[in-house]
UniProtKB/Swiss-Prot annotation:
It is found in: Cell membrane. Keywords: ATP-binding, Cell membrane, Membrane, Nucleotide-binding, Translocase, Transport. CDD domains: ABC_cobalt_CbiO_domain1. The lineage of its organism: Bacteria, Bacillati, Bacillota, Bacilli, Lactobacillales. This is Energy-coupling factor transporter ATP-binding protein EcfA1. InterPro entries: AAA+_ATPase, ABC_transporter-like_ATP-bd, ABC_transporter-like_CS, ABC_transpr_CbiO/EcfA_su, ECF_ABC_transporter_ATP-bd, EcfA_1, P-loop_NTPase. Residues 9-246 form the ABC transporter domain. SMART domains: AAA. Belongs to the ABC transporter superfamily. Energy-coupling factor EcfA family. Forms a stable energy-coupling factor (ECF) transporter complex composed of 2 membrane-embedded substrate-binding proteins (S component), 2 ATP-binding proteins (A component) and 2 transmembrane proteins (T component). It comes from the Bacteria.
Length: 285
């Protein structure tokens, strides 16, 4: 097997069937994720997204098949390499309350470092650094359960960052936040990804969130329907419909305008820019 040097994740022929289930939850899925990029796995409820997240760090093990491969950062996932993989892959779940273990924010963020027997002075400096990166320095003595939903997610992300993972999986981790909170966390993730050269694999049923990614994987009933850039994925309206999803608002409006013969320049690629462009067009008429 030859791995593409620039892919941090290579998945081939991945299938998984839950015990007592007749139908596989994940069916012969193959994809790769280039290092330092953001990939979003999108699919409706029950399409198999969380199962794939759990397979990627060995919480679940794939169905037996000699052709199946999960390779992360050059390490092929087996029962033996599971702990090496877990050091490289951090998962932030939907409900951060289930992840907190420390009485205070700083204790919580330090937890993974304590487990890895990191010396105290180094631990303190890492905790300060990651709390600073997620904008939570002022809350280090707070009890995690009394924080807002967005603040809790920041602390959960800091705890994962502290371990120094190569890949961060975000499993519906903004789904409990209001739109403004969601946007702030997505912006933070993009910032962290760029500053730390991290690879992000986010999982969502919210198609609007998928717009932020470099690559989108579309999952339906356990099968991968497509993998491409957001622009190319959202060109294919029938693909999105077949996956039981809806187009993001920006693409809906853009497609309607194109159908009415109004061409939209490529650089007009956000709702904000589209509104500005239409106002300019209107003032010229
Ligand atoms: N522990 C389990 N035992 C048996 N079946 C399961 C288990 N967990 C999930 N499933 C089934 O596997 C399929 C995929 O579930 P999964 O949670 O991966 O989907 P999902 O896309 O993450 O859904 P959601 O968006 O609702 O979280 C579903 O049919 C689900 O009912």
């Amino acid at each position: 097997m030859i791995f593409m040097k620039d892919n941090i994740v290579t998945v081939e022929h991945l299938s998984f069937t839950y015990k007592d289930s007749e139908e596989p939850a994940v069916k012969d899925v193959s994809f790769s994720i280039p290092k330092g990029t953001w990939t979003t796995l999108v699919g409706h409820n029950g399409s198999g997204k969380s199962t794939i997240a759990r397979l990627l760090n060995g919480i679940l093990l794939p169905d037996d098949n000699p052709e199946t491969l999960i390779n992360i950062d050059g390490i092929t996932l087996t029962e033996k390499t599971m702990w090496d993989i877990r050091d490289r892959v951090g998962i932030v779940f939907q409900n951060p309350d289930n992840q907190f273990v420390g009485a205070t924010v700083e204790d919580d963020v330090a937890f993974g470092l304590e487990n890895r027997q990191v010396p105290r002075p180094k631990m303190k400096s890492i905790v300060q650094d990651v709390l600073n990166q997620v904008g939570m320095t002022n809350f280090q003595k707070s009890e995690p359960q009394y924080l807002s939903g967005g603040q809790k997610q920041r602390v959960a992300i800091a705890g994962i960052l502290a371990i120094g993972p190569k890949l961060i999986i975000l499993d519906e981790s903004t789904s409990m936040l209001d739109p403004a909170g969601k946007f702030k966390i997505l912006k933070l993730i993009r910032k962290l990804q760029k500053e730390n050269e991290l690879t992000i694999f986010s999982i969502t049923h919210d198609i609007n969130e998928a717009e932020h990614a470099d690559q989108i994987l579309v999952l339906d009933k356990g099968s991968l329907l497509a993998s491409d850039s957001p622009v190319d994925i959202f060109k294919d309206v029938s693909l999105i419909k077949n996956a039981g999803l809806d187009l993001p608002l920006f693409y809906k409006i853009k497609n309607k305008l194109i159908n009415k013969g109004i061409s939209i320049p490529q650089e007009v690629n956000t709702e904000e820019k589209l509104v500005k462009y239409l106002c300019q067009l209107n003032s010229k008429m």
